[in-house]
């Protein structure tokens, strides 16, 4: 008898396709070898003492096993564990405990980050706590966040849309590796440069309208003297600039007294200024009505004989003091008004609106009022003990007909 022909050994290198998830089984022994893919730990207590750190290649099948596998391919019913390679199996046994279904792998794509945002580094972002990390203070809490600066416009060109991977299935039903088309790289972005600015010329004025001269613009600091000064913002100037400005400057609040402000307000308005001068005039008129008769009486008392008028002769010193006070007060009142009248006749018409003149008049008025009070006190001290008859008798002595 002729010996049977030896079957041709099938290729043993290509047993599995790990990326596609399909097993091409050739024999039962090879399927068991493929199923046990987990490397066994051949070490001691720690992984540092492993004996074999690299996996050994699978041993080649013996000729007896090759003969059995060839028979199993010819008659699949004899060995139900074998599966034909042409048919894509739904479930492939790899162990006695369960089965594994083939899974199609899909490439994972991450969403692109917005411009200006960096991808977080997992090594740097790890919390550094240590043993007492719970009690450590977070340094980022006290850091003040600066406002984000507005992004400069960037000229970008449209990029090609992303192409999803296409899956190609062969006619046999076994999926292959997904084919991914790479998107076209975008051109480098070029930042926009600001356009140069040129001085803008003013629009021409309509016919019949004159341009404002530059001389009027110089008086922009004195807008506070206008009627609508309350609506305009007040300007802060130094002391030298305030002294150079007009009398009615209402912005100089910190450097002048309240009385100065009141005087400035009085002089600024015509009605209040006239009312103020009327008050000053009436007060000085009353002072003159007191001191003019007093001067005449004291002038007569000084010349009376001591034998006939012993009461008057006893107060000679007081009479002389009152006579001098009366002359001084009348001169203080008369000279300023006479001077103002002369200046008005010479052409200086703003004397009544001058702040120094106004201050001088008010100081003289207060001084004359104090002399008035002093004169009243001296008269009461000198002639309080005289009765009305003696006073009347002394006054009759002033009559030149007697």
UniProtKB/Swiss-Prot annotation:
It is found in: Cell membrane. NCBIfam families: MPN157. It comes from Mycoplasma pneumoniae (strain ATCC 29342 / M129 / Subtype 1). It is a multi-pass membrane protein. Its main location: membrane. Keywords: Cell membrane, Membrane, Transmembrane, Transmembrane helix. Residues 30-39, 49-67, 135-148 have a biased composition (Basic and acidic residues). Residues 1-213 are annotated as: Disordered. This is Uncharacterized protein MG144 homolog. Residues 158-185 have a biased composition (Low complexity). The chain crosses the membrane at residues 279-299, 325-345, 360-380. The lineage of its organism: Bacteria, Bacillati, Mycoplasmatota, Mycoplasmoidales, Mycoplasmoidaceae. The keyword Transmembrane helix applies. Residues 1-10 have a biased composition (Pro residues). It comes from the Bacteria. The keyword Iron does not apply. Signal peptide: none annotated.
